[in-house]
Amino acid sequence: MRVGAHVSIAGGVDNAVTNELDVGGNCGQIFTHSPQVWQDPNIGADEAAAFREGTAADLDGPWVIHSSYLVNLCTPKDDLRAKSIDSMQAEVDAAHTLGIPYVNVHLGAHTGAGVDDGLDNAASALDELDIPDDVTVLIESDAGSGTKLGGDFEHLHEVLTRSDQDLDVCIDTAHAFAAGYDLSTEAAVNDTLAAFDDVVGLDHLQYVHLNDSKHACGTNKDEHAHIGEGHIGEAGMRAFINHDAIADVPLVLETPHEDGRGFAWNIDRVRDLRA
């Protein structure tokens, strides 16, 4: 199975390969810069080459880049929209440089513009990107708090339909659970993945953020827990990981570092739960 974690690129993006190996991962996710500031990736040719070579030699892949937390594709504000588009263009260009096939992004919040206008804003913003042929933008499912979009699978479908780009999807299990899609039992997992297939299509599911949830289903609260130890729980996680629809989908963890346990413990847990 392909499972890894979101790892640091401190000291150079090529260090992500070693960091991934250190936690037992064989695929993974990175930020190309601090996600809390507007900043373009600064990746030198030598470190990009070392990253590509290290990935090819030591990992199964694929990697995914997580875009900045400041990006808001749904915004009605022209200045924020322009910054979001510029930031996303820099990310897809960095992905091409690094040989990373995916850039993951949250749709953002409509901040009062309304769901339909927010979805239109997101689709049209994505249409302004010049995405390299070897890179795909993944729309991430959201927990659905406030005016954030992406919590409803229909939101994902609408953006994929309204945009002229060739887009796919990343499901975050904690987000989907918080948004009201139950994953705590085998029956619930079957129902949720069937619902996703009906609305979006499992052919669009290219990556999973595998996280348990510290809060109950439908609370719209986004706080991750160790695998099998949150409200999704061991039974739900086992059912999800072993579902036929997930068998070949790469899994990346964004689980907490607490109680003396980090990514290595959680990756081992995932492998233990895989039948």
From Swiss-Prot:
InterPro entries: AP_endonuc_2, AP_endonuc_F2_Zn_BS, Xyl_isomerase-like_sf, Xyl_isomerase-like_TIM-brl. Signal peptide: none annotated. Zn(2+) 1 binds at H66, H106, E140. Binds 3 Zn(2+) ions. Zn(2+) 3 binds at H175, D222, H224. CDD domains: AP2Ec (cd00019). SMART domains: AP2Ec. One of its GO terms (molecular function) is DNA binding. One of its GO terms (biological process) is base-excision repair. It catalyses: Endonucleolytic cleavage to 5'-phosphooligonucleotide end-products. The keyword Calcium does not apply. NCBIfam families: nfo (TIGR00587). This is Probable endonuclease 4. It comes from Halobacterium salinarum (strain ATCC 700922 / JCM 11081 / NRC-1) (Halobacterium halobium). The lineage of its organism: Archaea, Methanobacteriati, Methanobacteriota, Stenosarchaea group, Halobacteria.
